[in-house]
Amino acid sequence: KIWHHTFYNELRVAPEEHPVLLTEAPLNPKANREKMTQIMFETFNVPAMYVAIQAVLSLYASGRTTGIVLDSGDGVSHTVPIYEG
């Protein structure tokens, strides 16, 4: 429901017309990733999607490919070492 609300009420886009970038926490189980992919393709008919680890994208945003990212969120914090991206 959150993705439906985001696509149609917040972004006001047709998801079948836009590739999607999803982020995930480190060590997200493969089953979760597969379910996200299934929902995006089968429910929203997105043309393409990519799933990336949040910490890696944070490091890229700082212009680096190697570093340690401390990702502190609402209910959990992760320290993620990344070597050459």
From Swiss-Prot:
Reaction catalysis annotation: ATP + H2O = ADP + phosphate + H(+)
Principal subcellular localisation of the protein: cytoplasm
The EC number(s) this enzyme carries: 3.6.4.-
PROSITE patterns reported for this sequence: ACTINS_ACT_LIKE
Pfam family, one: Actin
Gene3D superfamilies from the UniProt entry: 3.30.420.40
An example Gene Ontology CC term for this record: cytoskeleton
InterPro entries: Actin (IPR004000), Actin/actin-like_CS (IPR020902), ATPase_NBD (IPR043129)
Single annotated GO MF: hydrolase activity
Keyword terms, alphabetized: ATP-binding, Cytoplasm, Cytoskeleton, Hydrolase, Nucleotide-binding
Subcellular location as annotated: Cytoplasm, Cytoskeleton
Family from the record: Belongs to the actin family.
Role summary: Actins are highly conserved proteins that are involved in various types of cell motility and are ubiquitously expressed in all eukaryotic cells. Essential component of cell cytoskeleton; plays an important role in cytoplasmic streaming, cell shape determination, cell division, organelle movement and extension growth.
Protein name: Actin
UniProt organism field: Oxybasis rubra
